[in-house]
């Protein structure tokens, strides 16, 4: 057993993860072929999460926040509570309404649009709450009161004065959210039947292809 473990570590140092029991191909080659799809989905999901998170955060600190705050807080809470698998099924049903299964619109949305939207929506809630907390702290700063005294309108005050100081905690959160999004690709790729490391992991476990599953986990 120790000899086998030593051989495994030696192969791991050479990026030799063995061969697939199902196809006979090297595991490293199989993983390398699927990795670009997962990276593309994770980056697109991160962009969606940032856009939605900042939008919800800005809406929650508007002058008329009595109307926008409940909506923004509700959407952020829903994003944090709704499972990716459930929101993915809802997104598929919505995508089918936009066009027949073979239309170009439906193919585009199923290819990257809907998976990225579902994946990014699951992370936008935490970003929105952090943006709102940072901007509320910044809005109470003396320089914001000075900008208001100079007659700067609320919209420009939010964008040019309050948003930039509130970016620091969000930037530190991006690394955590990126790791979360990579983990979320397992469910997203499986729900949307999209190629990638997540779908490869699920299929290798179901097929009993343990070298591939082991290589993905490592």
Give the positions of each predicted feature.
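An internal, D/E-rich "acidic patch" concept
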Residues: 1-54
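Membrane-water interface segments at the C-terminal ends of transmembrane alpha-helices
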Residues: 7-10, 74-103, 118-123, 129
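Alpha-helical transmembrane segments of integral membrane proteins
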Residues: 31, 35-68, 84, 104-218
């Amino acid at each position: 057993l120790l000899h086998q473990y030593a051989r495994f570590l030696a192969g791991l140092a050479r990026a030799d993860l063995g061969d697939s029991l199902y196809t006979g191909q090297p595991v490293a080659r199989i993983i390398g072929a699927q990795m670009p799809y997962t990276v593309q989905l994770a980056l697109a999901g991160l962009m969606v999460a940032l856009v939605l998170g900042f939008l919800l955060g800005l809406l929650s600190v508007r002058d008329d926040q009595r109307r926008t705050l409940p909506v923004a807080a509700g959407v952020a809470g829903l994003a944090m509570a709704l499972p990716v698998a459930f929101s993915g099924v809802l997104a598929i049903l919505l995508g089918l309404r936009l066009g027949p299964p073979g239309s170009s619109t439906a193919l585009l949305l199923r290819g990257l649009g809907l998976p990225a939207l579902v994946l990014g929506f699951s992370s936008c809630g935490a970003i929105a709450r952090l943006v709102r907390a940072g901007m509320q702290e910044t809005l109470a700063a003396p320089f914001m009161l000075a900008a208001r005294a100079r007659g700067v309108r609320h919209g420009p005050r939010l964008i040019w004065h309050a948003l930039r100081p509130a970016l620091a905690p969000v930037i530190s959160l991006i690394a955590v959210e990126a790791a979360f999004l990579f983990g979320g690709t397992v469910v997203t790729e499986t729900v949307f039947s999209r190629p990638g490391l997540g779908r490869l992991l699920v299929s290798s476990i179901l097929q009993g292809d343990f070298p591939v599953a082991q290589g993905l986990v490592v």
